[in-house]
């Protein structure tokens, strides 16, 4: 291989290595984002379930008279 082609070959190798690392990083980030979205979805469902339970508990709670003084008065 001529001397003038050596730097080009080295540059090409460096670019290929760099792309390989970038591909690995992209895959890792994609997996992380996917896991985070799954966790967000699960937490959103959990919050909705808690909200529904709270609404149900509030609707089943006995209504307090509006003008009644608290017992400590």
Curated annotation (Swiss-Prot):
It comes from Rhodopseudomonas palustris (strain BisA53). Residues 57-67 have a biased composition (Low complexity). Belongs to the SlyX family. The lineage of its organism: Bacteria, Pseudomonadati, Pseudomonadota, Alphaproteobacteria, Hyphomicrobiales. Residues 54-73 are annotated as: Disordered. Gene3D superfamilies: 1.20.5.300. Transmembrane segments: none annotated. Pfam families: SlyX. This is Protein SlyX homolog.
């Amino acid at each position: 291989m001529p001397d003038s082609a050596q730097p080009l070959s080295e540059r090409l190798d460096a670019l290929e290595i760099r792309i390989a690392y970038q591909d690995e990083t992209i895959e890792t980030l994609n997996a992380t984002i996917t896991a985070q979205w799954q966790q967000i979805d699960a937490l959103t469902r959990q919050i909705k379930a808690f909200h529904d339970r709270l609404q149900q508990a509030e609707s089943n709670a006995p209504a307090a008279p509006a003008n009644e003084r608290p017992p400590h008065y």
